């Protein structure tokens, strides 16, 4: 099972690349890697990013998005890594701007997936908040690759397009025993300031 850290966004709203922003002296991407490593669930953790940022990561497993799908958002990162690892049975996806994700959240979602896998033949297990799904904290089966490819070749790179074609189920973020901010993504500097005040 591989983990994909999505870190290819332009971070326009934040003002600088979010992967290298810091919480308590630790970069977002380092925090996410450390959390994923602590679960002992993954045989490889891969950072998905763009050519401009790739050399700035102090980490060996960095993959640049497929050049045919530049600037097509997070689906391009998932697509690129799934294509490179056709033998893999499952992928966990998390965005780099979710620095407070916990190992407990990852393992809880995995247990949810496994418990529903046989009965529901799930392709995707994701979290949801107030009825809205969070596609960038989710497990994806390789079966999702076809729907992702189709979306990337259309003019709509929305996860909604992908999810409509797949067997998907959701776990509420409140079902995780963790601080209430564990799943929050940081879009603006004031989001980070507010998070730091809570820590």
From Swiss-Prot:
Signal sequence annotation: none
First-listed, main subcellular location of the protein, grouped into a coarse class: cytoplasm
Domain remark in the UniProt entry: The N-terminal domain determines nucleotide recognition and specific binding, while the C-terminal domain determines the specific binding to the target protein.
Compartments it resides in: Cytoplasm
Sections of the chain in a coiled coil: none
Residues binding GTP, per UniProt: 6-8, 18, 65, 97
Organism from which the protein derives: Staphylococcus aureus (strain NCTC 8325 / PS 47)
Gene name of the record: mobA
Lineage: Bacteria, Bacillati, Bacillota, Bacilli, Bacillales
Recorded GO CC terms: cytoplasm
Cofactor(s) for this UniProt protein: Mg(2+)
Positions that bind Mg(2+): 97
Protein name, entry field: Probable molybdenum cofactor guanylyltransferase
Matches recorded under CDD domains: MobA
Function text: Transfers a GMP moiety from GTP to Mo-molybdopterin (Mo-MPT) cofactor (Moco or molybdenum cofactor) to form Mo-molybdopterin guanine dinucleotide (Mo-MGD) cofactor.
Keyword ATP-binding: no
A GO BP entry: Mo-molybdopterin cofactor biosynthetic process
């Amino acid at each position: 099972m591989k983990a994909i850290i999505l870190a290819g966004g332009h971070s326009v709203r934040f003002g600088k690349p979010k992967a290298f922003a810091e919480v308590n002296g630790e970069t977002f991407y380092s925090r996410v890697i450390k959390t994923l490593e602590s679960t002992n669930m993954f045989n490889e953790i891969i950072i998905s990013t763009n050519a401009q940022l790739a050399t700035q990561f102090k980490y060996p497993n960095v993959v640049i998005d497929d050049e045919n799908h530049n600037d097509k958002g997070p689906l391009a990162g998932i697509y690129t890594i799934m294509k490179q690892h056709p033998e893999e049975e499952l992928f966990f996806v998390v965005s780099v701007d979710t620095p407070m994700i916990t190992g407990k959240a990852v393992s809880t979602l995995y247990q949810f997936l496994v418990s529903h896998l046989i009965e529901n033949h799930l392709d995707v297990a994701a979290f949801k908040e107030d009825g809205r799904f969070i596609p960038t904290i989710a497990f994806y089966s390789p079966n999702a690759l076809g729907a992702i490819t189709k979306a990337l070749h259309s003019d709509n790179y929305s996860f909604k397009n992908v999810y409509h074609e797949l067997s998907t189920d959701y776990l509420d973020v409140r079902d995780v025993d963790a601080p209430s901010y564990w799943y929050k993504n940081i879009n603006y500097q004031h989001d980070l300031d507010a998070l730091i005040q809570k820590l």
